[in-house]
From Swiss-Prot:
Gene: nef
Protein name per UniProt: Protein Nef
Organism (species): Human immunodeficiency virus type 2 subtype A (isolate ST)
Keywords: AIDS, Host cell membrane, Host membrane, Host-virus interaction, Lipoprotein, Membrane, Myristate, Viral immunoevasion, Virulence
Acidic: annotated span: 87-95
Family: Belongs to the lentivirus primate group Nef protein family.
Subcellular location, record wording: Host cell membrane
Length: 255
């Protein structure tokens, strides 16, 4: 039910969910079962769920992968962005994503229509729904779309929180929703503390564990801008003193 052109791009997103679940040295990952309200471990090829954690890769520091979703990067910045992206990704990340080092198609900027189409396409393939969010998984998604679709990864960012995090790029239909994760076993030496169910809250400045949720209404309502215009700075249309005061009141750093 995506927009026209989705069928032509059905092949690239095949296996995206498996790549997001896959971690270096492990064959499983985790997602949140909203029906059962519990963590499920997906074992590749087994089709079974287990209430046991698996391990995720190293934590990606917030701010290392900077996005500017409210504007398209200038043509001259594409080269520097590409170099930054390659510098940020190590060999383990390339193995994890499983896509070519060189993009299959020419690089292009994300657009509203492209974001909307890719959102529906990923939903049809079950790529993000219920997956725990982490900085590393966001990188995997960015790299995957760049290599397969040529989409420069200077677009994927969300509102600061706490609570539901709305995408700042209008047309991207995936938001981040906080969930409660049982903490029993956290103090056990055998408990895997580097699973995304555990590390997501450490990546988040508010200590919340987040999962991706598809929201088709985001195609028509720019919730990020409506609810939090101050996060867009000078692009918000607010007086500078006002948007800075709002950011300061929410504890969000600004320059």
């Amino acid at each position: 039910m995506g927009a026209s052109g989705s069928k032509k791009r059905s092949e690239p997103s095949r296996g995206l969910r498996e790549r997001l679940l896959q971690t270096p040295g492990e064959a499983s990952g985790g997602h949140w079962d909203k029906l059962g309200g519990e963590y499920l471990q997906s074992q590749e090829g087994s089709g079974r769920g287990q209430k046991s954690p698996s391990c995720e890769g190293r934590r990606y520091q917030q701010g290392d992968f900077m996005n500017t979703p409210w504007r398209a990067p200038a043509e001259g910045e594409k080269g520097s962005y590409k170099q930054q992206n390659m510098d940020d990704v190590d060999s383990d990340d390339d193995d994890l994503v499983g896509v070519p080092v060189t993009p299959r198609v020419p690089l292009r900027e994300m657009t509203y229509r492209l974001a909307r189409d890719m959102s529906h396409l990923i939903k049809e393939k079950g790529g993000l729904e219920g997956l725990y969010y982490s900085d590393r998984r966001r990188r995997v998604l960015d790299i995957y779309l760049e290599k397969e679709e040529g989409i420069i990864g200077d677009w994927q960012n969300y509102t600061h929180g706490p609570g539901v995090r709305y995408p700042k790029f209008f047309g991207w239909l995936w938001k981040l929703v906080p969930v409660d994760v049982p903490q029993e076993g956290d103090d056990s030496e055998t408990h895997c503390l580097v699973h995304p169910a555990q590390t997501s809250r450490f990546d988040d400045p508010h200590g919340e564990t987040l999962v991706w949720r598809f929201d088709p209404t985001l195609a028509f309502s720019y919730e990020a801008f409506i609810r939090y215009p101050e996060e867009f700075g000078y692009k918000s249309g607010l007086p500078e003193d006002e948007w800075k005061a709002r950011l300061k009141a929410r504890g969000i750093p600004f320059s």
